[in-house]
Amino acid sequence: MAPEHAHYNGSKKIRSLREDKLASGAKARSRYGEACFQRGRVIKEARGQHTALRAGKDYETNLRRKREFRVPLELEPGRLRVQETTPSLDSAGTDDQDSENAESDGDLPIEVICDLEVIPQDVDEQELQRLRRENDRSSSPAGANEGIDDEEAGEEKVSFPSPQHSKHSHGPTGSEQEHFQRVSCVRHSYMQKLKLPQPLLAEELLERTLKYFPLVEKILSGQHPSMYYDHARSAFKRSRRAVLSIDEFRRLDLSLFTAGYYGVRRQMRVAVEVLHHYRDLIARQNNRVLRWWGVSDFAQYVLAPELLSALCQEEMNLPTLEDAWDVMEATTEFGLLVADDGPLEEWEVPAHLARLEAAGHSSNLREDPSNDKR
């Protein structure tokens, strides 16, 4: 073969190899470009799904915030649109999201666009005030609230008091006079039949009850009898639940768990002191009755009235604790109506005496339990 032909064939092979390399590189670049394009499309779709999900979750929050910032609403036939005065929460994000928000032109992310019907109302505030004044003048005491709901009637009384209500604003109402009359009758009746001691104020009550606090440990260990624990155990046995529910509590006869003539307020005050000293001890107990009631309720409805029963035995010089239980069961009405109505703290005494005087019971102040200074 001639040298020139050999050189020509060699050059041809080199060009073929170069073209093959260029073709393979082009194919690789093509595959790489296609892969980048696919990846970009996947990322864009993921961003779109994330934006739609976030818009769905934050729609209510965005709408509420737009209302709070008083964003003006523009109503068009069949669509609800917003005039963008401030950047919304959905507008923050990437450039793709910004472009999508720009194309939406302020449309709220509502999946179903409903037709809205706007009924304009022209209400003058002065006209409303004039109508209210006319209604007040024309209303009679017998039918002042006819055709008005209870809630609206209450607002009307507060905003526009009638002369009939303001006439007796500085004196006791008839219902308050009847209440004090009933309290006086109940107090006088129990004092005559049982000669009950006058209810103690909180400071002296705790001072005299403190010496009976060791009974808490004895009651928890079963070494001391307790009428209130027997009642609590009976309620537990009637239940099918692991703990005392609200419905079961409402069905309980709470008169069985009330500390007689001491009343509920003093009973709760003693229970707070019991929890202050014995909460950890009570919580460590494995007693099923106690766990069904719970620590706080067990202290209030079992331990506190039991300690006050011991104090009752001392105050009334009763021979046995059973006698004190009988007194506690028989004087529940006195405790709820008389003792709970009177003052518990020292600073409540002047206000209570002022109420009695305003109700016309100043002559009975010496008989009032709260007036005893001890």
From Swiss-Prot:
Coiled coil: none annotated. Residues 1-31, 75-106, 129-180 are annotated as: Disordered. It is found in: Cytoplasm; Nucleus. GO terms for cellular component: cytoplasm; nucleus. It holds the Pfam family RTC4. Its main location: cytoplasm. The keyword Disulfide bond does not apply. Residues 93-106 have a biased composition (Acidic residues). Belongs to the RTC4 family. May be involved in a process influencing telomere capping. This is Restriction of telomere capping protein 4.
